[in-house]
Amino acid sequence: MNGKRIQATGATLRVKQVRSVVGQKQNMRDTLRSLGLKRPGQVVERKADAATVGMINTVTHLVEVEEA
């Protein structure tokens, strides 16, 4: 799902940070922190509700997403 916009389905998504926030705008840093990601390589699982999907779509260039 990397690079593609995802939809809110209620499924569980596994989100992995693959790029650093160094050089990114502050809103990108804040979005990753809101998702619970602190460093590249870290993985979190989140429910695919509207708020989470919106955050993921904001930082698609920094994360990889797969269905859990």
From Swiss-Prot:
Its GO biological process terms? translation
GO MF terms listed in the record are: structural constituent of ribosome
GO CC terms in record: cytosolic large ribosomal subunit
Key words, A-Z: Ribonucleoprotein, Ribosomal protein
Q: What Pfam families does the database record attribute to this sequence?
A: Ribosomal_L30
List, alphabetically, the NCBIfam families matched.
rpmD_bact
User: How is the quaternary structure described?
Assistant: Part of the 50S ribosomal subunit.
- Family per record: Belongs to the universal ribosomal protein uL30 family.
Protein name, UniProt field: Large ribosomal subunit protein uL30
The species this protein was found in = Kocuria rhizophila (strain ATCC 9341 / DSM 348 / NBRC 103217 / DC2201)
